[in-house]
From Swiss-Prot:
Gene: accD
GO CC aspect terms: acetyl-CoA carboxylase complex
Nucleotide-binding found in the keyword field: yes
Protein's UniProt name: Acetyl-coenzyme A carboxylase carboxyl transferase subunit beta
Organism: Clostridium perfringens (strain ATCC 13124 / DSM 756 / JCM 1290 / NCIMB 6125 / NCTC 8237 / Type A)
Associated pathway: Lipid metabolism; malonyl-CoA biosynthesis; malonyl-CoA from acetyl-CoA: step 1/1
Upper taxonomic lineage: Bacteria, Bacillati, Bacillota, Clostridia, Eubacteriales
Length: 292
């Protein structure tokens, strides 16, 4: 009996207290500015946004490369205050009268702070003059419409005329469906301009970023003299499920990744974002030619 008494469980009752926001004055509430913290898409770690920016928008915990806007990427890559933009106000039209397309473009312009899906211009990298085209996935997933194709083509023609090396950062979901065949023809137009640039023995470097797919992959993304890529990028033409459904086979887990393409010889080197400027500088130095 005594043993049973000693082993008997005892409970304590705690009265519940209801908490709500009205118990705190507005001045007492924590004030956390919007955008102060960022969550890594890969490891789910919460990161201080300012620290993330100082680390080239790469997660210090798992190495995941966050999405970069065109102007951010240009800032990381080029010598300070040397970038001069081309065709800044060029915007795509609506050749097929696609319902709601103009409103969609205006919405993305406001959200992404870029006018179109690519930013082009000339700049200096380690005191070497280059022509840059940087696609921005924040604007309609970097899709290639008539304005994107025209801006890239004009930039390439400028590089050819002035005998400058060309660097294109690709990031795209492919051709822009709202512009139909006008969008698809940009593949041939840009490729033709690249051919003429190469015919002058001028250097063309492509840097694949996440994601690079569709018509961009099928044209100028894979036409570089040297093809670099950031780690872990999705690079391909058709989607994984489409391919598996067509061939009735299971694809490898790493299919359509930069690492898979490097192993198969489709790209030349995978480069960490923090090392890109150094690697590109070395390539420019190795290919320097005095044309005078």
């Amino acid at each position: 009996m005594i043993k049973n008494l000693l082993n008997k469980r005892k409970y304590i009752t705690v009265s519940s207290v209801e908490l709500n926001d009205t118990e705190l004055n507005e001045d007492e509430k924590p004030n956390i500015p919007s955008g102060m913290w960022s969550k890594c898409e890969k490891c789910a770690k919460i990161l201080y946004t300012e620290d993330l920016r100082e680390n080239f928008n790469v997660c210090p915990n798992c190495g995941h490369h966050f999405k970069l806007g065109a102007y951010e990427r240009i800032k990381y890559l080029t010598d300070e205050n040397t970038f001069v933009e081309f065709d800044k106000k060029m915007v795509g039209r609506n050749p097929l009268d696609f319902n709601g397309y103009e409103e969609k473009i205006k919405g993305y312009q406001k959200k992404s702070h870029v006018i179109e899906g690519v930013v082009t211009g000339e700049a200096y990298i380690a005191q070497r003059k280059v022509v840059l085209c940087v696609m921005d996935s924040n604007f309609m997933m970097g899709s290639m419409g008539t304005a994107v194709g025209e801006k890239i083509t004009r930039a390439i023609e400028y590089a050819t005329k002035n005998r400058l090396p060309l660097i294109i950062f690709t990031c795209s979901g492919g051709a822009r469906m709202q512009e139909g065949i006008y969008s698809l023809m940009q593949m041939a137009k840009v490729s033709g301009a690249i051919y003429r640039h190469g015919r002058e023995n001028l250097l063309y470097i492509t840097v694949l970023t996440n994601p690079t797919t569709g018509g961009v992959t099928a044209s100028f993304a894979m036409e570089g003299d040297i093809i670099l890529s950031e780690p872990g990028c999705l690079v391909g033409f058709a989607g994984r499920r489409v391919i598996e459904g067509t061939i009735n086979e299971k694809l490898p887990d790493d299919f359509q990744t930069a690492e898979f393409l490097l192993e198969k010889g489709f790209i030349d080197k995978i480069v960490q974002r923090k090392d890109l400027k150094q690697v590109i500088t070395s390539l420019l130095r190795m290919h320097e030619v005095d044309y005078e």
